[in-house]
Amino acid sequence: MRALRAGLTLASGAGLGAVVEGWRRRREDARAAPGLLGRLPVLPVAAAAELPPVPGGPRGPGELAKYGLPGLAQLKSRESYVLCYDPRTRGALWVVEQLRPERLRGDGDRRECDFREDDSVHAYHRATNADYRGSGFDRGHLAAAANHRWSQKAMDDTFYLSNVAPQVPHLNQNAWNNLEKYSRSLTRSYQNVYVCTGPLFLPRTEADGKSYVKYQVIGKNHVAVPTHFFKVLILEAAGGQIELRTYVMPNAPVDEAIPLERFLVPIESIERASGLLFVPNILARAGSLKAITAGSK
């Protein structure tokens, strides 16, 4: 685990908050119970009118965007989760979902679900089932199907290929599955359990002493194989206290005998490695936060 933590050294970047206000509106329309995610703040963005003109330059941002902008963050709001898609890797940057006891029960039947392409993603940038065929990797859910038994549509949505990543079968079916089960079990102790899951592509120092970010790609669409996965659990107690549990696992076979707490890492490590920010959004609403790390109680 020391090596794992030492590897989490990528620079931090954009935050998680830009999507959550839209999520709040959609979930209110669906009469979902209020929770932490709906109260997280949207990150401030300067309005175009506030940008000073440059002498001799374009008359404003509108002129620069005359023929459109080549790419924007691809946010996807599903029945059961919100996802930010990365067209470069053919997968998600992160997926956010809310777990509650009543959502873990229902008529959702995994046998009625099939992995399928996400037609909302441009054909140039989407994964297909053919990419996984013969690759040796599982189609590993980010938002787990078992988290959303409350409706068939909610479970179906977890089978979009935009919500999966190439995952070593032993990890997917054992240690990672155990972490998903543990996440669900926390709904018995907490009022709301928010889960953010995503891939990591971590650097490794090689024989020449230099560090490189290297990862495999599969299929004709070059779907990126993460080196690691993270899972951030934001736990909201009935009294309003917020607890944070943050995990990283390598995309490799992991001995099931290793306790899950061995994979706890400081949230700062995930923020630096993923380019996401969690703590500022939480503190803006909660005011205080208890982070659980390995060895803490």
Curated annotation (Swiss-Prot):
Q: What ranges does the record give for the region Essential for deoxyribonuclease activity, renumbered to this chain?
A: 286-296
Q: Locate the Phosphothreonine modifications and list their residues.
A: T128
Q: What is the effect of changing S288A?
A: Loss of phosphorylation. Suppresses interaction with YWHAG and induction of autophagy
Q: Which residues carry this modification: Phosphoserine?
A: S288
- Where found, per UniProt? Mitochondrion
* Impact reported for T128D: Phosphomimetic mutant. No effect on its interaction with YWHAG. Enhances interaction with YWHAG
- Coiled coil location: none
Pfam families tied to this protein: Endonuclease_NS (PF01223)
- What GO molecular-function term can you cite, just one? RNA endonuclease activity
Q: Keywords on this record?
A: Disulfide bond, Endonuclease, Hydrolase, Magnesium, Manganese, Metal-binding, Mitochondrion, Nuclease, Phosphoprotein, Transit peptide
Q: Which residues bind Mg(2+)?
A: N172
What is one GO cellular-component annotation here?
perinuclear region of cytoplasm
Reported modifications of this chain? GSK3-beta-mediated dual phosphorylations at Thr-128 and Ser-288 is necessary for its interaction with YWHAG and the induction of autophagy.
Tell me, what is an example of a GO biological process annotation in this record?
positive regulation of autophagy
Q: What is its EC number?
A: 3.1.30.-
Q: Where is the transit peptide?
A: 1-48
Does the keyword Metal-binding belong to this entry? yes
Which residues are the active-site ones?
H141 (proton acceptor)
* Site for Essential for catalytic activity, residues: R110
Q: What does this protein do?
A: Endonuclease that preferentially catalyzes the cleavage of double-stranded 5-hydroxymethylcytosine (5hmC)-modified DNA. The 5hmC-modified nucleotide does not increase the binding affinity, but instead increases the efficiency of cutting and specifies the site of cleavage for the modified DNAs. Shows significantly higher affinity for four-stranded Holliday junction over duplex and single-stranded DNAs. Promotes conservative recombination when the DNA is 5hmC-modified.
* Subunit-structure text: Homodimer; disulfide-linked. Homodimerization is essential for enzyme activity. Interacts with YWHAG.
Q: What is this protein called?
A: Endonuclease G, mitochondrial
What is the source species?
Homo sapiens
